[in-house]
């Protein structure tokens, strides 16, 4: 499956997962023109609608795509929020140019995986920012995949 993000694209495979450009946003996904904010984090259903499955772009790019099924906690890099997710817990804190987002593995596990970003193409996230994206596997289990951006626009899986 793939997500359209601003002028660039973002693709992901849920089984093990990897991110790369290019791709397109399928009709099954929700396309948003603004980054998710804590006020839109609604825990009204197990899907956590409108929350995190985000294409992280440079600060000038404000369009993000969300995958309803694999959404977890909404927490963009410039905000602070925390709380229970039902499948575990997650928290994230803004640290300016060292911002970090932590996401639950989703199955009750307390473990986390992190993504270490370099500065290539991510000017607002260039000082050691770390992100983790949960993947929903066909087996019904959650798996967290970590990625590292590479100069030249491709994303490769980062072994945690």
From Swiss-Prot:
Q: Does the keyword rRNA-binding apply?
A: no
Q: Which InterPro entries match?
A: KRTAP_PMG
Q: Which residues form a coiled coil?
A: none
Q: Where is this region: 4 X 10 AA approximate repeats?
A: 41-86
Give start and end residues of every sequence repeat. 41-50, 51-60, 61-70, 77-86
What superkingdom does the record give?
Eukaryota
Cellular component aspect of the GO annotation: cytosol; intermediate filament
Pfam families, A to Z: PMG
Q: Which keywords does the record carry?
A: Keratin, Repeat
The free-text function statement in the UniProt record for this protein reads: In the hair cortex, hair keratin intermediate filaments are embedded in an interfilamentous matrix, consisting of hair keratin-associated proteins (KRTAP), which are essential for the formation of a rigid and resistant hair shaft through their extensive disulfide bond cross-linking with abundant cysteine residues of hair keratins. The matrix proteins include the high-sulfur and high-glycine-tyrosine keratins.
Q: Which family does it belong to?
A: Belongs to the PMG family.
Q: How does it assemble?
A: Interacts with hair keratins.
Q: What is the recorded name of this protein? A: Keratin-associated protein 13-4
Q: Which organism is it from?
A: Hylobates lar
